[in-house]
Protein backbone atom coordinates (compact mmCIF):
# COMPACT_ATOMS: atom_id res chain seq x y z
CA UNK A 1 0.00 0.00 0.00
CA UNK A 2 1.31 3.41 -0.99
CA UNK A 3 -1.49 5.58 0.29
CA UNK A 4 -0.29 9.14 0.93
CA UNK A 5 0.02 10.09 4.59
CA UNK A 6 -2.42 12.77 5.71
CA UNK A 7 -1.10 16.26 6.49
CA UNK A 8 -3.84 18.06 8.37
CA UNK A 9 -1.65 21.16 8.75
CA UNK A 10 -2.14 21.65 5.01
CA UNK A 11 -5.62 20.27 4.45
CA UNK A 12 -7.52 21.63 7.44
CA UNK A 13 -8.35 25.18 8.46
CA UNK A 14 -8.07 26.39 12.04
CA UNK A 15 -11.38 26.69 13.84
CA UNK A 16 -10.17 29.88 15.56
CA UNK A 17 -8.99 32.43 13.02
CA UNK A 18 -6.21 33.98 15.10
CA UNK A 19 -2.72 34.82 13.89
CA UNK A 20 0.21 33.63 16.03
CA UNK A 21 3.34 35.62 16.80
CA UNK A 22 5.60 32.58 17.09
CA UNK A 23 5.31 28.84 16.59
CA UNK A 24 8.09 26.29 16.79
CA UNK A 25 10.14 24.13 19.13
CA UNK A 26 11.90 24.64 22.44
CA UNK A 27 14.83 22.81 23.97
CA UNK A 28 16.17 21.08 20.87
CA UNK A 29 19.60 19.64 21.70
CA UNK A 30 22.43 19.84 19.19
CA UNK A 31 26.24 20.08 19.17
CA UNK A 32 27.50 23.47 18.03
CA UNK A 33 30.97 24.41 16.87
CA UNK A 34 32.48 27.77 17.77
CA UNK A 35 35.31 29.88 16.37
CA UNK A 36 36.56 31.33 19.67
CA UNK A 37 40.08 31.63 21.01
CA UNK A 38 40.78 28.92 23.58
CA UNK A 39 37.62 26.95 22.76
CA UNK A 40 38.58 23.66 21.14
CA UNK A 41 35.52 21.47 21.47
CA UNK A 42 31.90 21.60 20.28
CA UNK A 43 29.39 22.72 22.90
CA UNK A 44 26.14 21.02 23.91
CA UNK A 45 23.49 23.58 23.04
CA UNK A 46 19.76 23.89 23.69
CA UNK A 47 17.92 25.68 20.91
CA UNK A 48 14.48 27.29 20.65
CA UNK A 49 13.47 28.07 17.06
CA UNK A 50 10.25 29.54 15.71
CA UNK A 51 8.60 31.29 12.80
CA UNK A 52 5.54 33.51 12.79
CA UNK A 53 2.15 32.28 11.63
CA UNK A 54 0.45 35.46 10.54
CA UNK A 55 -2.20 33.82 8.34
CA UNK A 56 -5.01 32.71 10.68
CA UNK A 57 -6.39 30.33 8.06
CA UNK A 58 -3.23 28.18 8.15
CA UNK A 59 -3.69 25.45 10.76
CA UNK A 60 -0.03 24.86 11.63
CA UNK A 61 3.60 25.09 10.60
CA UNK A 62 5.93 22.24 9.59
CA UNK A 63 8.18 21.69 12.60
CA UNK A 64 10.13 18.90 10.93
CA UNK A 65 11.37 21.44 8.37
CA UNK A 66 12.79 23.60 11.15
CA UNK A 67 14.36 20.61 12.86
CA UNK A 68 16.08 19.41 9.70
CA UNK A 69 17.44 22.89 8.97
CA UNK A 70 18.88 23.11 12.49
CA UNK A 71 20.29 19.59 12.26
CA UNK A 72 22.11 20.36 9.01
CA UNK A 73 23.37 23.61 10.48
CA UNK A 74 24.82 21.87 13.53
CA UNK A 75 26.42 19.23 11.33
CA UNK A 76 28.10 21.48 8.79
CA UNK A 77 28.36 25.08 10.03
CA UNK A 78 30.40 27.03 12.58
CA UNK A 79 28.37 29.40 14.73
CA UNK A 80 28.73 32.99 13.50
CA UNK A 81 26.50 35.97 12.68
CA UNK A 82 26.61 35.12 8.98
CA UNK A 83 25.67 31.46 9.39
CA UNK A 84 22.96 32.30 11.92
CA UNK A 85 21.45 34.80 9.51
CA UNK A 86 21.47 32.21 6.75
CA UNK A 87 19.76 29.66 9.01
CA UNK A 88 17.03 32.10 10.03
CA UNK A 89 16.44 33.14 6.43
CA UNK A 90 16.13 29.48 5.45
CA UNK A 91 13.59 28.98 8.25
CA UNK A 92 11.42 31.72 6.77
CA UNK A 93 11.81 30.40 3.22
CA UNK A 94 10.84 26.91 4.37
CA UNK A 95 7.47 28.31 5.47
CA UNK A 96 6.51 30.55 2.59
CA UNK A 97 3.48 28.30 2.11
CA UNK A 98 2.45 29.37 5.63
CA UNK A 99 3.04 33.03 4.75
CA UNK A 100 5.74 33.32 7.43
CA UNK A 101 7.96 36.40 7.22
CA UNK A 102 9.91 36.28 10.49
CA UNK A 103 12.07 33.76 12.33
CA UNK A 104 13.78 33.72 15.67
CA UNK A 105 16.21 31.48 17.48
CA UNK A 106 17.53 31.27 21.04
CA UNK A 107 20.64 29.21 21.61
CA UNK A 108 22.00 28.45 25.10
CA UNK A 109 25.15 26.60 26.13
CA UNK A 110 28.04 26.57 28.57
CA UNK A 111 31.26 27.86 27.04
CA UNK A 112 34.24 25.94 28.45
CA UNK A 113 37.73 27.35 28.13
CA UNK A 114 41.04 27.01 29.92
CA UNK A 115 42.15 29.80 32.22
CA UNK A 116 45.75 30.13 33.46
CA UNK A 117 46.63 30.53 37.12
CA UNK A 118 47.58 34.03 38.23
CA UNK A 119 51.19 33.22 39.14
CA UNK A 120 52.12 29.56 38.69
CA UNK A 121 53.48 28.92 35.20
CA UNK A 122 51.94 26.01 33.33
CA UNK A 123 49.00 25.72 35.71
CA UNK A 124 45.50 26.14 34.29
CA UNK A 125 41.98 24.80 34.64
CA UNK A 126 38.60 24.73 32.96
CA UNK A 127 36.12 27.53 33.49
CA UNK A 128 32.50 27.54 32.35
CA UNK A 129 30.54 30.56 31.14
CA UNK A 130 26.78 30.25 30.52
CA UNK A 131 26.05 31.93 27.17
CA UNK A 132 22.82 32.73 25.35
CA UNK A 133 22.23 34.02 21.81
CA UNK A 134 18.94 35.65 20.81
CA UNK A 135 18.60 36.10 17.05
CA UNK A 136 15.69 37.30 14.91
CA UNK A 137 15.29 37.65 11.14
CA UNK A 138 12.84 40.06 9.56
CA UNK A 139 12.77 41.92 6.25
CA UNK A 140 16.20 40.61 5.32
CA UNK A 141 17.92 41.83 8.47
CA UNK A 142 19.49 39.97 11.38
CA UNK A 143 19.16 41.27 14.94
CA UNK A 144 21.51 39.44 17.30
CA UNK A 145 22.01 39.80 21.04
CA UNK A 146 24.61 37.87 23.02
CA UNK A 147 24.57 37.42 26.78
CA UNK A 148 27.00 35.74 29.17
CA UNK A 149 27.33 35.11 32.90
CA UNK A 150 30.71 35.96 34.45
CA UNK A 151 31.49 34.85 38.00
CA UNK A 152 33.75 36.97 40.18
CA UNK A 153 34.58 37.72 43.81
CA UNK A 154 33.39 40.88 45.54
CA UNK A 155 34.71 42.26 48.84
CA UNK A 156 32.60 44.83 50.67
CA UNK A 157 34.26 48.29 51.01
CA UNK A 158 32.32 49.07 54.19
CA UNK A 159 33.28 45.78 55.79
CA UNK A 160 36.91 46.38 54.81
CA UNK A 161 36.87 49.81 56.48
CA UNK A 162 35.31 48.38 59.64
CA UNK A 163 37.91 45.62 59.70
CA UNK A 164 40.74 48.13 59.32
CA UNK A 165 39.35 50.15 62.23
CA UNK A 166 39.34 47.08 64.47
CA UNK A 167 42.89 46.24 63.42
CA UNK A 168 43.94 49.82 64.08
CA UNK A 169 42.46 49.62 67.58
CA UNK A 170 44.21 46.35 68.31
CA UNK A 171 47.52 47.76 67.06
CA UNK A 172 47.14 50.91 69.18
CA UNK A 173 46.30 48.85 72.24
CA UNK A 174 49.47 46.84 71.76
CA UNK A 175 51.95 49.54 70.75
CA UNK A 176 50.29 52.87 71.62
CA UNK A 177 52.34 53.48 74.77
CA UNK A 178 55.70 52.81 73.14
CA UNK A 179 57.76 55.77 71.96
CA UNK A 180 59.67 53.53 69.59
CA UNK A 181 58.44 50.44 67.79
CA UNK A 182 60.84 47.94 66.26
CA UNK A 183 59.77 47.24 62.65
CA UNK A 184 60.46 43.53 63.06
CA UNK A 185 58.26 43.47 66.15
CA UNK A 186 55.48 45.15 64.14
CA UNK A 187 55.96 42.68 61.30
CA UNK A 188 55.65 39.76 63.72
CA UNK A 189 52.54 41.26 65.29
CA UNK A 190 50.93 41.84 61.89
CA UNK A 191 51.72 38.32 60.78
CA UNK A 192 49.92 36.99 63.85
CA UNK A 193 47.11 39.55 64.13
CA UNK A 194 46.41 41.16 60.74
CA UNK A 195 43.36 38.90 60.39
CA UNK A 196 42.04 40.15 63.74
CA UNK A 197 39.04 41.16 61.64
CA UNK A 198 38.41 40.42 57.97
CA UNK A 199 35.92 41.94 55.51
CA UNK A 200 33.18 39.78 54.10
CA UNK A 201 33.43 38.74 50.48
CA UNK A 202 31.35 36.49 48.29
CA UNK A 203 31.01 34.85 44.93
CA UNK A 204 29.15 37.16 42.56
CA UNK A 205 27.74 37.01 39.02
CA UNK A 206 27.55 39.63 36.29
CA UNK A 207 25.09 38.92 33.48
CA UNK A 208 25.87 41.05 30.45
CA UNK A 209 23.98 41.39 27.18
CA UNK A 210 25.23 43.18 24.09
CA UNK A 211 23.89 43.90 20.62
CA UNK A 212 26.17 42.45 17.95
CA UNK A 213 26.83 44.84 15.06
CA UNK A 214 25.08 43.95 11.79
CA UNK A 215 28.39 43.91 9.92
CA UNK A 216 30.11 41.68 12.50
CA UNK A 217 31.73 38.51 11.17
CA UNK A 218 32.39 36.98 14.60
CA UNK A 219 30.38 36.55 17.78
CA UNK A 220 33.30 37.73 19.93
CA UNK A 221 32.23 35.73 22.99
CA UNK A 222 35.68 35.53 24.56
CA UNK A 223 36.33 39.19 23.74
CA UNK A 224 33.18 40.11 25.68
CA UNK A 225 34.00 37.83 28.61
CA UNK A 226 37.60 39.05 28.81
CA UNK A 227 36.46 42.69 28.83
CA UNK A 228 34.09 42.06 31.73
CA UNK A 229 36.64 40.12 33.76
CA UNK A 230 39.25 42.80 33.21
CA UNK A 231 36.83 45.50 34.33
CA UNK A 232 35.92 43.66 37.52
CA UNK A 233 39.47 42.62 38.34
CA UNK A 234 38.53 39.59 40.46
CA UNK A 235 37.29 36.75 38.21
CA UNK A 236 37.04 33.45 40.05
CA UNK A 237 39.99 31.14 39.50
CA UNK A 238 40.34 27.51 38.45
CA UNK A 239 43.48 25.59 39.50
CA UNK A 240 45.53 27.44 42.13
CA UNK A 241 48.56 27.00 44.34
CA UNK A 242 49.36 29.13 47.38
CA UNK A 243 51.08 31.81 45.32
CA UNK A 244 47.99 32.11 43.12
CA UNK A 245 45.68 32.27 46.13
CA UNK A 246 47.82 35.02 47.61
CA UNK A 247 47.67 36.95 44.34
CA UNK A 248 43.89 36.54 44.32
CA UNK A 249 43.71 37.91 47.87
CA UNK A 250 45.67 40.95 46.70
CA UNK A 251 43.29 41.48 43.77
CA UNK A 252 40.31 41.38 46.11
CA UNK A 253 41.95 43.96 48.37
CA UNK A 254 42.71 46.21 45.41
CA UNK A 255 39.21 45.92 43.94
CA UNK A 256 36.80 46.48 46.81
CA UNK A 257 33.32 46.93 45.38
CA UNK A 258 29.69 47.36 46.21
CA UNK A 259 27.18 45.90 43.79
CA UNK A 260 26.75 49.44 42.41
CA UNK A 261 30.48 49.68 41.71
CA UNK A 262 30.49 46.38 39.86
CA UNK A 263 27.56 47.33 37.60
CA UNK A 264 29.12 50.69 36.76
CA UNK A 265 32.55 49.22 36.05
CA UNK A 266 31.17 46.67 33.63
CA UNK A 267 28.83 49.05 31.81
CA UNK A 268 31.64 51.57 31.42
CA UNK A 269 33.86 48.86 29.92
CA UNK A 270 31.17 47.93 27.37
CA UNK A 271 30.13 51.40 26.25
CA UNK A 272 31.62 52.34 22.91
CA UNK A 273 32.31 48.71 22.03
CA UNK A 274 28.71 47.73 21.30
CA UNK A 275 25.62 49.40 19.89
CA UNK A 276 23.75 48.53 23.09
CA UNK A 277 24.55 46.79 26.34
CA UNK A 278 22.90 45.86 29.61
CA UNK A 279 24.42 44.69 32.88
CA UNK A 280 22.81 42.85 35.79
CA UNK A 281 24.95 41.93 38.80
CA UNK A 282 24.22 39.89 41.92
CA UNK A 283 26.36 39.58 45.03
CA UNK A 284 25.45 36.43 46.97
CA UNK A 285 25.98 38.10 50.32
CA UNK A 286 27.83 36.24 53.07
CA UNK A 287 26.66 38.85 55.60
CA UNK A 288 22.95 38.56 54.74
CA UNK A 289 20.56 35.75 53.81
CA UNK A 290 19.58 37.76 50.72
CA UNK A 291 21.45 39.01 47.64
CA UNK A 292 22.49 42.50 46.62
CA UNK A 293 21.62 43.39 43.01
CA UNK A 294 22.06 46.21 40.50
CA UNK A 295 21.09 46.72 36.86
CA UNK A 296 21.83 49.19 34.10
CA UNK A 297 21.09 49.28 30.38
CA UNK A 298 21.45 51.57 27.39
CA UNK A 299 19.12 49.50 25.19
CA UNK A 300 16.37 51.69 23.77
CA UNK A 301 13.12 51.03 25.60
Swiss-Prot record:
Catalytic activity line of the entry: GTP + H2O = 7,8-dihydroneopterin 3'-triphosphate + formate + H(+)
Sorted UniProt keywords: Hydrolase
Site note May be catalytically important, residues: 156
GO BP terms: tetrahydrofolate biosynthetic process
EC code(s) of this entry: 3.5.4.16
Pathway it works in: Cofactor biosynthesis; 7,8-dihydroneopterin triphosphate biosynthesis; 7,8-dihydroneopterin triphosphate from GTP: step 1/1
InterPro entries per record: GTP_cyclohydrolase_FolE2, GTP_cyclohydrolase_FolE2/MptA
GO MF, one example: GTP cyclohydrolase I activity
Function: Converts GTP to 7,8-dihydroneopterin triphosphate.
Family to which the UniProt record says this protein belongs: Belongs to the GTP cyclohydrolase IV family.
Record protein name field: GTP cyclohydrolase FolE2
Organism taxonomic ancestry: Bacteria, Pseudomonadati, Pseudomonadota, Gammaproteobacteria, Pseudomonadales
Amino acid sequence: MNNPLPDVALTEVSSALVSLDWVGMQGVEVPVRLAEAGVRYPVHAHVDLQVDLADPSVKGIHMSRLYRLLDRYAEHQILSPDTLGALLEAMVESHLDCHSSRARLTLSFNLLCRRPALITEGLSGWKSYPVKLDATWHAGRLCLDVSADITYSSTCPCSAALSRQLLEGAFTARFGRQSFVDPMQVATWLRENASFATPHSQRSVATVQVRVAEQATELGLMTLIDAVEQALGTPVQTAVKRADEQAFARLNGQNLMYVEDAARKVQQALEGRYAASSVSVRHFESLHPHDAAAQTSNYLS
